[in-house]
């Protein structure tokens, strides 16, 4: 390797070593291991673990791209094929992903170089999660601001991966929700119409938004709720696709089925408690439906 000597201690590009190390360990298995302290030997490192999580996100991401397209064409009353819907959704989604990774990794590299430590691997997943929990119509400049806020305030001020007390992806969403609520809620932000005319009778409200307005849920749509072809954030509408990702995490040993099951049990029990003294449609919603609505599974 004729390049590495320039980046190691004493080389003319020594300060840029964290950036070099990030690319090297992403492409190749690291040639160094821990030397002291308690540690566990494993066949994969943290970057490979994060890549596995990214693979587990693919079912929800790909379905979300298709769902964005099919809701768009339904809203404007235009016929479509599976590929036409997917292509439209992918073209709308890719700029969000590019901005999330571009802005976030730039900040990560800046902090790593200034502090002289390795680039944290956690953003490989965070960079994908942020656009997946956003409305498809979120302005790109807002996404930039939310990513900057999430990475700096939600992560780097605490020391980086493993030391942050806030979830960076949820921090980005919470920031936009409180700073620009009109762009993060309502019945118009979840479906991209390219400013076209919406057909009569079409509503872009999410099922939970209808329930919050005391509109009973249509029980004939339970199948759609589970499959996910309903309005909502890009990656969180399809419980089916999310469960496919969970299977990948469990099969590879990255995720614990006990942890996942406990979350669903806890959510189900809490929903039953609300059912006991339900005073509105949202609290009266059957407990099992809470598990497939509102991005709970995601």
Range-by-range predicted roles:
Residues 252-298:
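Alpha-helical transmembrane segments
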Residues 34-40, 104-116, 152-162, 244-253, ...:
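C-terminal ends of transmembrane helices
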